[in-house]
Amino acid sequence: MFRPASRALLRAPTPAVGVARGPTRRFISSSTGSTKPRSWKNTFIRVGLASGAVYYYNTSSVFAETPSLSFRPEAQPKHEDGKSLPTLDSIKPKSREEKKAPAAAADAAATPASTGANAQSESPLKSAEELEAEADQQAAFNPETGEINWDCPCLGGMAYGPCGEEFRAAFSCFVYSEEEPKGMDCIDKFKAMQDCFRAHPDVYGAELDDDEEAGAEANAAGVEQPLAAEVDASVPVEKHEQAKEVRDEVKSAAGEVAESEEVVPKALDVSEQEKTPEQQTEK
């Protein structure tokens, strides 16, 4: 009469119950069955963000250094009509000149050095007048203050040599001399300087040689001067007058008699003195 509850439940009809299932997987490519239309606000925001990104990309300095890709070849500069492209023949002379340039520079550097050495060696050989002229030009002597710069290179260092004191005395005397001709009152000081030069031939040998050559030339000029005057006389009358003047000078210097007086030979004078007084009276 009473059935068990378990059997009653099993035999009882079960109503259709929907099975609860989880959410199915959905891919990006798959779309839902129903899509909602976007609002105008959402579209406006999207357009504003896109335009802002483009503006920032074009105006910002972050992307300024990025190279731009271009498929067009770069335009090459056009050569002028008067200029031609370099050739092998035109390049060879330039390469040779570039090779010769270092040698020429070395020669040019050696030439001033040799010139300076020659100038230093020739500086002691200059006369006092030349030294004074160079001193005026190179500011060794200041006429306004009356001071002499003994360190001037134009003096050749002679103011500090073994005969430096004598050279200073002679040079300063010549510079300050007011006699005519200039330097006549400084002869003694120049002689003292030359004596000092002779005492040091190892230092002033070149100066002594120049002095001897100058003296020899002066003596030769003095001896040859009458001969040159005789040669220059083109008229026989002038030659005769010059010869007569020379003869008169020689006679006056030797104390001889003039041409108007009688000239007695020496042998005749001796023979007359040997004669006896009787022979002289007979004559």
Swiss-Prot record:
<keyword id="KW-0999">Mitochondrion inner membrane</keyword>
<feature type="compositionally biased region" description="Basic and acidic residues">
    <location>
        <begin position="272"/>
        <end position="283"/>
    </location>
</feature>
<keyword id="KW-0472">Membrane</keyword>
<dbReference type="InterPro" id="IPR039289">
    <property type="entry name" value="CHCHD4"/>
</dbReference>
<keyword id="KW-0653">Protein transport</keyword>
<feature type="transit peptide" description="Mitochondrion">
    <location>
        <begin position="1"/>
        <end position="35"/>
    </location>
</feature>
<feature type="disulfide bond">
    <location>
        <begin position="163"/>
        <end position="196"/>
    </location>
</feature>
<feature type="disulfide bond">
    <location>
        <begin position="173"/>
        <end position="186"/>
    </location>
</feature>
<dbReference type="GO" id="GO:0005743">
    <property type="term" value="C:mitochondrial inner membrane"/>
</dbReference>
<keyword id="KW-0812">Transmembrane</keyword>
<feature type="topological domain" description="Mitochondrial matrix">
    <location>
        <begin position="36"/>
        <end position="46"/>
    </location>
</feature>
<keyword id="KW-0560">Oxidoreductase</keyword>
<feature type="compositionally biased region" description="Basic and acidic residues">
    <location>
        <begin position="237"/>
        <end position="251"/>
    </location>
</feature>
<feature type="topological domain" description="Mitochondrial intermembrane">
    <location>
        <begin position="65"/>
        <end position="283"/>
    </location>
</feature>
<dbReference type="InterPro" id="IPR010625">
    <property type="entry name" value="CHCH"/>
</dbReference>
<feature type="region of interest" description="Disordered">
    <location>
        <begin position="72"/>
        <end position="136"/>
    </location>
</feature>
<feature type="compositionally biased region" description="Low complexity">
    <location>
        <begin position="102"/>
        <end position="119"/>
    </location>
</feature>
<feature type="domain" description="CHCH">
    <location>
        <begin position="160"/>
        <end position="204"/>
    </location>
</feature>
<feature type="compositionally biased region" description="Basic and acidic residues">
    <location>
        <begin position="91"/>
        <end position="101"/>
    </location>
</feature>
<feature type="transmembrane region" description="Helical; Signal-anchor for type II membrane protein">
    <location>
        <begin position="47"/>
        <end position="64"/>
    </location>
</feature>
<dbReference type="GO" id="GO:0005758">
    <property type="term" value="C:mitochondrial intermembrane space"/>
</dbReference>
<protein>
    <recommendedName>
        <fullName>Mitochondrial intermembrane space import and assembly protein 40</fullName>
    </recommendedName>
</protein>
<keyword id="KW-0813">Transport</keyword>
<feature type="region of interest" description="Disordered">
    <location>
        <begin position="211"/>
        <end position="283"/>
    </location>
</feature>
<feature type="short sequence motif" description="Cx9C motif 2">
    <location>
        <begin position="186"/>
        <end position="196"/>
    </location>
</feature>
<feature type="disulfide bond" description="Redox-active">
    <location>
        <begin position="152"/>
        <end position="154"/>
    </location>
</feature>
<dbReference type="GO" id="GO:0045041">
    <property type="term" value="P:protein import into mitochondrial intermembrane space"/>
</dbReference>
<keyword id="KW-0735">Signal-anchor</keyword>
<dbReference type="GO" id="GO:0015035">
    <property type="term" value="F:protein-disulfide reductase activity"/>
</dbReference>
<feature type="short sequence motif" description="Cx9C motif 1">
    <location>
        <begin position="163"/>
        <end position="173"/>
    </location>
</feature>
<keyword id="KW-0496">Mitochondrion</keyword>
<keyword id="KW-0676">Redox-active center</keyword>
<keyword id="KW-1015">Disulfide bond</keyword>
<keyword id="KW-0811">Translocation</keyword>
<comment type="function">
    <text>Required for the import and folding of small cysteine-containing proteins (small Tim) in the mitochondrial intermembrane space (IMS). Forms a redox cycle with ERV1 that involves a disulfide relay system. Precursor proteins to be imported into the IMS are translocated in their reduced form into the mitochondria. The oxidized form of MIA40 forms a transient intermolecular disulfide bridge with the reduced precursor protein, resulting in oxidation of the precursor protein that now contains an intramolecular disulfide bond and is able to undergo folding in the IMS.</text>
</comment>
<keyword id="KW-0809">Transit peptide</keyword>
<comment type="subunit">
    <text>Monomer.</text>
</comment>
<keyword id="KW-1133">Transmembrane helix</keyword>
<dbReference type="Pfam" id="PF06747">
    <property type="entry name" value="CHCH"/>
</dbReference>
